Design a protein with these regions (language model features):
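RecB-family 4Fe-4S metal-dependent nuclease core
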Residues: 1-135
Length: 135
């Protein structure tokens, strides 16, 4: 959800039915969805909507076990720095664009959820098991 305030600032909202990303994960760039949307809004990338500063990145809990429905968690410290976020995302894209770059299915095992609905697409079980894997 994109909210453009009367003061000319943006609030970027994600409705969550599951776990809300931690403040540390958002700040460290591990969870980038709202930051990408904020960058687009700040730079005027949404058609027919003006650019402007981002005042808030919020996750609204609408159901789930982690938080009570209705909880709103802000994930922005101070002001949104569009220039540094753009640089971070461009560096990240360049790293993935490098043909010499590997693409691990689980780059940080501490961040892997217990439920992995797309694990079969990464073939990670096959790689862990070696050549004798059969499904």
């Amino acid at each position: 959800r994109l909210e453009y305030g009367v003061d000319g600032t943006w609030t970027i909202v994600d409705y969550k039915t599951g776990v809300i990303p931690s403040h540390n994960h958002v700040r460290a760039g591990v969870r980038n969805q709202l930051a990408v949307e904020a960058l687009i809004a700040a730079e005027g990338g949404f058609s027919d909507l003006p650019p402007g500063p981002v005042a808030a990145l919020e996750y609204w809990q609408i159901s789930g076990r982690g938080s009570a429905p209705g909880d709103i968690k802000s994930r922005l410290d101070g002001t949104f720095d569009a220039a540094s976020k753009r640089q971070y995302l461009e560096n990240l894209a360049a790293e993935y664009d490098n043909p010499q770059c590997g693409y691990p299915s689980e780059p940080d095992p501490s961040l892997v959820p217990s439920f992995k609905p797309y694990e079969h697409l990464s073939r990670s079980r096959e790689w862990r098991s070696g050549a004798d894997y059969e499904d």
